[in-house]
A protein has these predicted regions:
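Structural signal for membrane-spanning alpha-helices in multi-pass inner-membrane proteins
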Residues: 20, 66-73, 100, 151-158
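Interfacial segments of alpha-helical transmembrane regions
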Residues: 1-14, 71-97
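Hydrophobic alpha-helical transmembrane segments of integral membrane proteins
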Residues: 87-109, 168-170
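Interfacial loop at the N-terminal end of multi-pass membrane proteins
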Residues: 15-60, 106-131, 168-169
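A hydrophobic membrane-anchoring alpha-helix module
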Residues: 141-161
Length: 170
C-alpha cells in the first residue's frame, strides 16, 4: 500500500509544482503584458476557479500522501525512505501551504477589492500585488520541486530496501 501512497504523493506534488511553475513562467508574465485591468480581471477569475474540490484534493494531497508513504515505509522498516518522505511533507507544508496561507491568499483577498474600472488605479494596484505575489510563488515553485525530489529519493530508497531484503542483503 505504501507504494500507492508514493505514487499519489509524487503525482500530487508534481501537479502542484507544475501549476506553480506555470504561474511563475507563463501566467504572471503574460498577465503583465495584457495590462492592469485585464490582469486584475483575469486573476479575479483564477481566484474564483481555484476554490474547487479537485484542486483542494491535489493541493492538500501533496501533504497527506507523503506522510502516509512515510508511515508505510517506517512500518516496513525503511527508515531512510520514511525520513525523506517526511522531509518532503515538511518542505511542502512550509514552502507551499505555509506561503500560500500566509502570503498568497492574503494578497488574493486584497486583489479581490480591486475594481476592473479605472486603469490608473489598477496599474498601481496590479504592480503592488503582482510583484510580491510572483516572488512568493517562486518560493512555492521551488518548495514543490524540492519536495518532489525528496519524494523521488524516498521512493528510490524504499524500492532499494525492498530489493536488498528480497536478496537477503541488509
Amino acid at each position: 500500500m505504501r507504494h500507492v501512497f508514493f505514487v499519489l504523493a509524487l503525482l500530487c506534488t508534481a501537479l502542484n509544482a507544475g501549476i506553480f511553475y506555470s504561474f511563475s513562467t507563463i501566467v504572471m508574465p503574460g498577465l503583465d503584458l495584457g495590462g492592469a485591468a485585464s490582469a486584475v480581471n483575469a486573476m479575479h477569475g483564477i481566484n474564483t476557479i481555484v476554490r474547487s474540490p479537485i484542486f483542494a484534493i491535489v493541493f492538500f494531497g501533496a501533504l497527506v500522501m507523503p506522510l502516509l508513504a512515510a508511515f508505510g515505509s517506517r512500518s516496513a522498516g525503511h527508515r531512510g525512505a520514511a525520513r525523506l518522505a517526511g522531509l518532503a511533507a515538511l518542505i511542502y507544508a512550509a514552502a507551499v501551504i505555509g506561503v500560500t496561507l500566509q502570503v498568497n491568499v492574503p494578497l488574493n483577498e486584497t486583489l479581490a477589492s480591486f475594481t476592473v474600472a479605472g486603469t490608473d488605479a489598477n496599474a498601481a494596484n496590479w504592480k503592488e500585488f503582482a510583484g510580491p505575489w510572483a516572488l512568493w510563488n517562486h518560493v512555492r515553485t521551488l518548495g514543490a520541486i524540492l519536495a518532489l525530489l525528496c519524494l523521488l529519493a524516498a521512493w528510490a530508497v524504499d524500492l532499494t530496501s525492498v530489493n536488498r531484503r528480497s536478496y537477503g542483503l541488509r
